[in-house]
Amino acid sequence: MNINKQRVLDEFFELIKIPCPSLGERQVADLLKQKLEELDGKVTEDMQAAKALNGTAGNIVADFTGTVAGAPRILLNAHMDCVNPCAGINPRMEDGVIKSDGTTILGGDDKGGVVAILETLRCLKEQNLPHGDIQVVFSVSEEQGCAGAKNLDTTLLHSDIGYALDSSGRPGKIIFAAPGQNKIFAKVHGKTAHGGVAPEKGINAIKKAAEILMDVPTSRIDEETTCNIGIIHGGSATNIVPDLVEIAMDCRSRNPEKLEKLTADIVAAYKKGGEKAGVPVDVEVKPSYKPYCLAKDSKVIRLAAQAAENLGLPVDITATGGGSDSSHFNGFGIPCTVLGTGMTNVHTVDEILLEEDLYMTCQWALDIICLAAKQ
């Protein structure tokens, strides 16, 4: 019941070399469809998500019939897209550490998870290992607010529990709780005028926005609640008084009541700030996903923890402040945890992945499936 380490490494290098920005996953999606079909999977491309997002590919869903009746049906998830810069990745190995050449990301987020799922499927087939039904979901656009999973055609899903292989932290890390997220968009309106000829006839939306933002909650609110002002757009030229500023932020909490209150407080702060500044402010709230909290003794957590212990891995059952596709799977009614894959310094050109962690993630995923078939 052992993985093929050389095959894992070769496939990881193969996949990370394919450019796959969010909404541009077509090339890697075609390759993964081929690989899944070669493993006897019933493969479906979820075009509902592709159309909703106007992307080049949809989520890839593949079903594999189990050999053990009554075993839990398990969903395995990883995402196909990467953040930029992800074109021209030139991987290298130095003393057991996989890294890029420093001009791009590495792509372990989340090709490490993709490779682990593929290797698990191969080992099950080649070694005739007992297993229950398996459903693989390779999602698109995870790096853009988990948009692929959010727009997934849920009629395709029929799993009992799920594992998203998509967390920083070494194998053995198991996420039992994650926050819900709301995105908040505000438009601060001013009045345009010539900045040199008649600035007093204008109302500077940038200055007004700055005044308003002084009273908008931000950063860490408490141990499980945060909010962040992430994007501000405004102005078109230095000699024009800007008449519009657009602000985007998100707020998160693992407590649904706290998330609701923080969202309401932010909206109220914008409205009150606009009244105080004497300018109109439009505010829109877009819920992204709901928080979840899995019992530490639930089946999905217990299986992952037992498999990790059997491999001698230190088990770390913990909460996170980040979102992932698992948030949506839990929302769809499938208890789903996130597993640590060893990805480090993600979303930067300093990203690395220990060779040992790449292999161990594959072995851990395989052992979870085999352990589930025995229970």
Name these PLM-found stretches:
Residues 8-9, 58, 232, 243, ...:
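Zn-dependent metallopeptidase/amidohydrolase metal-coordination segment
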Residues 21-70:
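A non-catalytic alpha/beta surface segment that caps or lines the substrate-entry region
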Residues 1-26, 287, 344-348:
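N-terminal capping segment at the start of a domain
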Residues 13, 17, 228-236, 250-251, ...:
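A short beta-alpha structural unit
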Residues 104-179, 227, 231, 238-239, ...:
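Acidic/histidine-rich catalytic neighborhood of metal-dependent amide-processing enzymes
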Residues 29, 56-57, 63-65, 69-138, ...:
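Active-site metal-coordination/substrate-binding segment of hydrolases
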Residues 207-222, 228, 289-337:
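Active-site-adjacent substrate-binding region
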Residues 198-232, 240, 257-281:
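Acidic-enriched catalytic cores of C-N bond-cleaving enzymes acting on peptides and small amides
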